[in-house]
From Swiss-Prot:
GO terms for molecular function: acyltransferase activity; hydrolase activity. It is an enzyme of class 2 (transferase). It holds the Pfam family Beta-lactamase. Calbistrin A has been reported to possess a number of interesting bioactivities including antifungal active against Candida albicans and cytotoxic toward both healthy and leukemic human cells. Induction: Expression is induced in complex medium (Czapek yeast autolysate medium) supporting calbistrin production. Substrate binds at residues 176, 191. The active site is at residue 79. This is Acyltransferase calJ.
Amino acid sequence: MSDFDALLANYTSKETPKVHGVICKCVDRHGICPTPHLAKRDLRLTLLGNEIYSKVAGYDSVLPGASPLREDVVLKVASATKLITSIALLQCIDKGLIDLDEPVTKVLPEFDQKQILTDVSGSDLVLEPSKTPITARHLLTHTSGLGYPFTHRLLRLRAEVRNRAGVSPSLRVTERYEMPLVFEPGTGWLYGCSLDWAGVIVSRLHGGISLEQYFVENIWQRLGLSEPFPCFNIARHPEYNARVMGGAIQTPEGRLQPKDHWAFDNPEDQDGGSGLSCTTKDYVAVLADLVSDSPKLLKPATIAEMFTPQLEAKSPGVQMLLGLRPAWDTVSGPIAENAINHGLGGVLCMDDVPEIDQPKGMLGWGGASNIVWWVNRELRVAGFFATQQAPFGNPSVTRLVNAWKKDFWAQFKTIDHA
């Protein structure tokens, strides 16, 4: 038993779980044969790539009648939805429907004459006109100036002002995220609703088709997946909903309690930034395509651009990215501050992370339910870690993610890749 296996067994024990259930998968594009100890199970050919690492541990809920976790459980992947939406928007660029660096106002008139929120004084919002049009690149890199109320003080204060005024919050994407910017597009970085708006662009460029249906026709079916497909509004899909892994929340004392509702559950609309439900197989098929020699979803040059640093070194954008390290630290691992950047679709690790044996060149992100995905295009390998637990990046999950990576990379290096 490896150190990670021992830690995983301890953390997912039914009696005193720190994380009630975990799925870890890694795939590559090689067709290589792993050393006997590389995976618990035999090497299996997946829809794309080879599954070279697979561990499933723990239970499907924290309730007394919980069953051992199965790898075909349905997961609410939260902000890991953003990668799928990023790919969808990049497909629009590959098709010539929109350019990466042209203003998106021709598709999103809501972005015409955007204003920048510079202060909130009592109930008064201090606003000034924005001079820079928002582009698809801005949306894909979180440099648009758009945020979430929980990621920026001024947006939080604005939400409080609206709440005191009796403004009822909407769940429609175009109303929920109709908010001012907090900096001039392209001059900073802020985690926010950029990909939710990207989903609206994808829908409008295809005649108003729902984002869910676009994903079915242009992502899931293209990868060879079959029904039931990943979906939004999972309550409307009873056969899929019945397989959802139970959620949990870790108390300040470290105990786990059931969690039935997530903030990203949206019964009224399809958020490109969150809200997707899928299986591990579904998501890993996307990751495998990004490391494939013959990708089905995007042009190779477009995939290469995803892995290109989009923020200037030492720029305000990089400093703002570092200022929100809790949003991505569980994804990146203990990386040096001068080695972090952002690509098209995720945080980009520009150097090795020796503490966990992680090589440079990793693109990744995650989701509030403690989903973590990463792709190393140069080494043609990708990984996926899943549980259904809040809060994101809590110490128990972060330790498991780092230990998983270290276990995988140590074993990956023993393979003959010739």
